[in-house]
Amino acid sequence: MCKGLAGLPASCLRSAKDMKHRLGFLLQKSDSCEHSSSHSKKDKVVTCQRVSQEEVKKWAESLENLIHHECGLAAFKAFLKSEYSEENIDFWISCEEYKKIKSPSKLSPKAKKIYNEFISVQATKEVNLDSCTREETSRNMLQPTITCFDEAQKKIFNLMERDSYRRFLKSRFYLDLTNPSSCGAEKQKGAKSSADCTSLVSQCA
């Protein structure tokens, strides 16, 4: 985790530059997020305007609130990237996209891609699943359906909820959003109810 410039590895410093682009949320005109029509598994660029303190506080109520908000998801993903453990949220996102597929002919190739990337023995971003869930998901690959990853996705969600989500709420990635003054928001008149994420990347900048 990035705690200060002096103790950071070079890889963290490099990844921080990417975070600044990915976390370009919070311009100055709106409290809403612009939802992109497509998602790239690699660092999706999220363009959020400003996030109200009320919304930020909701993120602490549940992981579901956090990752179903465009800006919350971006902040959580950046936090996981700083810990080199973003494979879980990437898998969750891939499962969400998979369930939106309308064409039956596209299910099988997409399912195999997700399986090979996150679940197979040689997966490039293998997620931590128990043997029973892994075997069940492997059997589902014989005839992929829209629900073939449901159990695996649920297990990974529960894992994030118990572990990384709790650490996120104690991290600067979240705490700086709950304290706008630490980001210089007090200098902006009329911005008392909104959070600025500049300091989200300050630990690595």
Curated annotation (Swiss-Prot):
Supply the name of the protein: Regulator of G-protein signaling 4
Q: Which gene encodes it?
A: Rgs4
The entry's function note states: Inhibits signal transduction by increasing the GTPase activity of G protein alpha subunits thereby driving them into their inactive GDP-bound form. Activity on G(z)-alpha is inhibited by phosphorylation of the G-protein. Activity on G(z)-alpha and G(i)-alpha-1 is inhibited by palmitoylation of the G-protein.
* InterPro entries (alphabetical): RGS, RGS_RGS4, RGS_sf, RGS_subdom1/3, RGS_subdomain_2
**Pfam families, per this entry?**
RGS
Q: Name all RGS domain ranges.
A: 62-178
Instruction: Share the record's PTM remark.
Output: Either Cys-2 or Cys-12 or both are palmitoylated. Phosphorylated by cyclic GMP-dependent protein kinase.
Cell inner membrane: is it a keyword of this entry?
Answer: no
Its ancestry begins with: Eukaryota, Metazoa, Chordata, Craniata, Vertebrata
